[in-house]
C-alpha cells in the first residue's frame, strides 16, 4: 500500500506534537498532531494506519479503499467562528502558512486602537482616531510563477467574499479592501460584479510591479 508522509511542521512556527501512536487507525480528517507553540492542527488526509512516527513526520500506510467520508471537526455547538478556524487548522495560502486563527485573534474595532505611538506616527495628533477599521485582502499574487490566489478569486468569488465577511465579523473590522493587480482583468471584473451591492468591501487596483 502507498505510504503518506505528513510533516509535523507545515507552517511558520514550531513543529506540532503527534497525538496518535503507531498502529492507530485513522480516517480522513482524524486529528494527528497539535501545536506546541505557534502552529496549527494537522489532520490525516487518508484512511489507513499509522506505521511510523519520526522526529519530523508521521507516516501512514494508506488503505486500498479510500471512502469520501471524513471525520468532522470536533468543536462544541456554541463554538465561535474563531474557535472553529483554530480547530480546523486553517493557515494562510502564502509560503509561511501563517495560522489563520492567530492572525484573526485581534480586535480591530475603531474604538480599540491601543496605545498611541509617537515614535511611529510623529506627524499625527495624540488624540487621532481612525473613523474605520480595515482588513486588507492581499490578492496581488506578486510571484511570477504563482496563480492560485487569482484562480480561486475567479472560480470561487462568492466563497472568497463570504470568508472576508467572516474575518470582518471576527475582528470587528467595518471595512475590507481587496488589493489586486489591474492586469488580472477577469478576477477584477468578477470581484467588482460580486461586490456591486456591498458598501463595506471595495477593490483597489495595483500596478504590475515586483516585488509589491
Language-model-derived ranges and their functions:
Residues 40-47, 52-212:
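Iron-sulfur-associated redox domains of electron-transfer enzymes in respiratory
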Residues 1-14, 41-44:
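Short beta-strand-turn/beta-hairpin segments enriched in glycine/proline and small hydrophobics
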Amino acid at each position: 500500500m502507498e505510504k503518506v508522509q505528513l510533516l509535523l511542521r507545515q507552517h511558520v512556527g514550531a513543529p506540532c506534537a503527534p497525538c496518535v501512536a503507531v498502529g492507530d487507525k485513522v480516517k480522513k480528517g482524524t486529528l494527528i498532531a497539535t501545536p506546541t507553540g505557534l502552529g496549527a492542527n494537522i489532520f490525516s488526509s487518508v484512511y489507513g494506519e499509522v506505521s511510523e512516527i519520526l522526529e519530523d513526520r508521521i507516516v501512514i500506510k494508506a488503505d486500498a479503499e479510500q471512502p469520501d467520508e471524513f471525520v468532522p471537526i470536533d468543536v462544541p455547538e456554541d463554538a465561535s467562528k474563531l474557535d472553529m478556524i483554530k480547530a480546523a487548522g486553517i493557515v494562510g495560502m502564502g509560503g509561511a502558512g501563517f495560522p489563520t486563527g492567530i492572525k484573526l485573534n485581534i480586535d480591530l474595532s475603531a474604538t480599540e486602537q491601543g496605545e498611541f505611538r509617537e515614535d511611529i506616527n510623529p506627524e499625527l495628533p495624540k488624540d487621532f482616531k481612525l473613523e474605520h477599521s480595515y482588513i486588507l485582502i492581499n490578492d496581488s499574487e506578486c510571484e511570477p510563477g504563482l496563480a492560485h490566489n487569482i484562480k480561486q478569486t475567479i472560480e470561487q468569488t462568492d466563497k472568497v467574499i463570504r470568508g472576508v465577511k467572516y474575518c470582518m465579523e471576527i475582528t470587528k473590522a467595518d471595512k475590507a479592501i481587496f488589493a489586486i493587480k489591474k492586469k488580472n482583468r477577469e478576477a477584477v471584473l468578477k470581484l467588482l460584479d460580486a461586490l456591486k451591492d456591498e458598501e463595506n468591501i471595495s477593490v483597489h487596483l495595483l500596478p504590475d510591479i515586483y516585488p509589491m
